[in-house]
A protein has these predicted regions:
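Short, surface-exposed beta-strand/loop "edge" segments at domain boundaries and coil↔beta transitions
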Residues: 54-56, 89-92, 102-105, 173-189, ...
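Proprotein-processing/basic-patch segments
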Residues: 2-13, 59, 155-213
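Boundary/junction segments of secreted and surface-exposed precursor proteins
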Residues: 1-24, 214-222
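A short beta-strand-loop element at or near the start of a globular domain
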Residues: 24-88, 201
Length: 244
C-alpha cells in the first residue's frame, strides 16, 4: 500500500491562555505557533490552570498538516492516518477537515488558522458540524513508542481521490471537539511527531489503498481477487470474458 507523508510545514497552534474555556477554545487568532519542531508533548492538548489569587485559566492546542494527493488516481478504498506518538497519552484525538494553509497548501500555517476547521461552530460541539476524517482515540490507548492508527472516514477517502491537497487538523476529542470545558486543574495531552523529524521514520503519513479495476467476476469458480491474468492478459485490462 502506498504512503503519503505530511508536508514539512506541519505544526501546532496554541490558543491564548485566558480566563474562560470559551475564550481559549474559540480563539479566532491563536496565541502562538510552532512549525519547526520535530516532536511536541502537546500534539493535541487541553489545559486548565489555577490562577494566582484564585480562578482559572485555559489553553487549547491543535496540530495541522497537509498532504499532496494530486498524484492519486482511481478510487481510494481504504486510508489510515498514522501518527508516531511519544511521551504523553492521557488525552484524546480526532482528525477533522481543515482549511488551514490557505485552503490549498499554498500559504504557511499561521495563528489565525487556529479555528480553520470546516464546519467550525463557535460555542458548539463539532459533532455533526465538522467533517470528520477519522475515528477517535481516547485515554491511554495512545501509543507513546510507536505509530497510532486513525482509521480514515469515507469523507477523507473521497477528498483524497478528488482534491489535490488534503488538509487535516488533529485536535483533542473529549473536550475540544465536543466543547466540554476541562473540569479539574490538569493538562490532558498526547505527544506526537512532525515531518521535520530527520528522515521519515517518525513522520505523519497516510497509508492508503486504491481499489482494483478491471474484470471483477469469478472465472471457472475462482474468485477475481485470486486471479492475476486470464490467458496472459492482466485482469486490470479486461472488462469482459467471452462477452460477459
Amino acid at each position: 500500500m502506498p504512503n503519503l507523508y505530511s508536508n514539512n510545514d506541519d505544526g501546532y497552534i496554541t490558543s491564548s491562555t485566558v480566563a474562560t474555556w470559551a475564550g481559549a477554545r474559540d480563539d479566532t487568532t491563536g496565541g502562538s505557533i510552532n512549525t519547526s519542531s520535530t516532536f511536541s508533548s502537546i500534539f493535541t492538548a487541553v489545559s486548565k490552570y489555577a490562577s494566582r489569587g484564585g480562578g482559572s485559566t485555559y489553553r487549547v492546542v491543535r496540530s495541522f498538516m497537509y498532504f499532496d494527493t494530486s498524484s492519486i488516481t482511481g478510487t481510494v478504498s481504504a486510508a489510515t492516518i498514522k501518527i508516531r506518538g511519544g511521551s504523553f497519552n492521557d488525552g484524546s484525538i480526532i482528525a477533522v477537515k481543515s482549511t488551514a494553509f490557505g485552503g490549498d497548501g499554498g500559504t504557511s500555517l499561521s495563528t489565525s488558522d487556529f479555528d480553520a476547521i470546516t464546519g467550525y461552530s463557535t460555542g458548539s460541539s463539532l459533532a455533526g458540524n465538522a467533517t470528520d476524517y477519522s475515528n477517535t482515540i481516547t485515554s491511554t490507548s495512545w501509543s507513546t513508542s510507536g505509530y497510532n492508527d486513525l482509521t480514515g472516514t469515507s469523507d477523507l477517502r473521497t477528498d483524497m481521490q478528488n482534491d489535490n491537497v488534503v488538509i487535516i487538523c488533529l485536535m483533542d476529542y473529549t473536550n475540544d471537539y465536543l466543547n466540554s470545558a476541562v473540569g479539574s486543574t490538569t493538562t490532558l495531552n498526547y505527544g506526537g511527531y512532525y515531518a521535520n523529524y530527520t528522515g521519515t521514520s517518525r513522520d505523519p503519513y497516510i497509508e492508503y489503498t486504491i481499489a482494483a479495476t478491471g474484470y471483477a467476476n469469478n472465472v471457472n469458480g475462482v474468485a477475481a481477487a485470486n486471479i492475476g491474468k486470464i490467458n496472459g492478459v492482466a485482469t486490470a485490462n479486461i472488462e469482459k470474458v467471452n462477452g460477459i
